[in-house]
Amino acid sequence: MRKILVTGGAGFIGSAVVRHIIRNTRDAVVNVDKLTYAGNLESLTEVADNPRYAFEQVDICDRAELDRVFAQYRPDAVMHLAAESHVDRSIGSAGEFIQTNIVGTFNLLEAARAYWQQMPSEQHEAFRFHHISTDEVYGDLGGTDDLFTETAPYAPSSPYSASKASSDHLVRAWLRTYGLPTIVTNCSNNYGPYHFPEKLIPLMILNALDGKPLPVYGDGMQIRDWLFVEDHARALYQVVTEGVVGETYNIGGHNEKANIEVVKTICALLEELAPEKPAGVARYEDLITFVQDRPGHDVRYAVDAAKIRRDLGWLPLETFESGLRKTVQWYLDNKTWWQNVLNGSYRLERLGTGK
């Protein structure tokens, strides 16, 4: 049985990883999360009482607390997902992204290195530091049909992607300089249950159910590759347990869709699954409202996931159609979860005008 320290385990992808490990493996999890606005322990209700699960409310920028957690739990691996991740928010509040994504990653690397250096030789050899990143570090594919491979040059476009690119470089440098056994993964856009409603898909679902406008940036033709979060969680666990030290693995869903197509598909699913509409709404699609594009908005991201398929045998199980249907149905069935989220300070709107 491994003990895996997961940072950001109360976030969207992190909670999916924690649920996957507790539900489908014999490994134990130590969840380290600061619990910012997007961290939600209600996403972990099913594992909260499991003896293989522990939670520590710790900020990765707090080195002393990280040292305590490593000493107390003595993990066999780290899966680093703690990050500020919303592009729109990074445009207006870049400092938070620099602090968490760069300084926080540095602190975690140093705490992990100090812990790793004093491990017994057998555990020392088996230890892994898995850094979870994004395809946005590669920049924009523009109008081409190309895919980002693991060797694509970095060209981040936003404060968010620049901060993640910086953290990727730190992780690789700690392997090359100090020998810390690191692995990096870069993923495409995730979606699925428990997604915080500032992101495109849950925002559209909840606004539509409330009869509010569905704000779409620019002409809506920006293309993203969509990855169901539970498929991603499987891939991440496979990488931390089977991946090769020093390697990078791109993880994608092979589901390229224009944003406007995604929104229209959500509307069509809601017509079927939630036909009783809010007052004054004839069709959900009538709520679509085009708004000013955000600064530096990338036209297209898409990753080539051939390497992880070839080397580790991972494939996504969900198509975009099956995954989106499951997601819409989950939000319809879990009103209490998202109402509790919305009762906080968050308001359903698109951010990122830079004003």
UniProtKB/Swiss-Prot annotation:
GO BP, sorted A to Z: dTDP-rhamnose biosynthetic process; lipopolysaccharide biosynthetic process; O antigen biosynthetic process; polysaccharide biosynthetic process
Matches recorded under Gene3D superfamilies: NAD(P)-binding Rossmann-like Domain (3.40.50.720), UDP-galactose 4-epimerase, domain 1 (3.90.25.10)
The reaction(s) this protein catalyses: dTDP-alpha-D-glucose = dTDP-4-dehydro-6-deoxy-alpha-D-glucose + H2O
Active site residues of this protein: 135-136, 160
MF terms (GO), sorted A to Z: dTDP-glucose 4,6-dehydratase activity
Keyword terms: Lipopolysaccharide biosynthesis, Lyase, NAD
Pfam family, one: GDP_Man_Dehyd
InterPro entries: dTDP_Gluc_deHydtase, NAD(P)-bd_dom, NAD(P)-bd_dom_sf
Bilayer-crossing regions: none
Cofactor(s) the protein requires to work: NAD(+)
NCBIfam families: dTDP_gluc_dehyt
Subunit structure: Homodimer.
Summary of the function given for this chain in its UniProt record: Catalyzes the dehydration of dTDP-D-glucose to form dTDP-6-deoxy-D-xylo-4-hexulose via a three-step process involving oxidation, dehydration and reduction.
Protein name per its UniProtKB record: dTDP-glucose 4,6-dehydratase
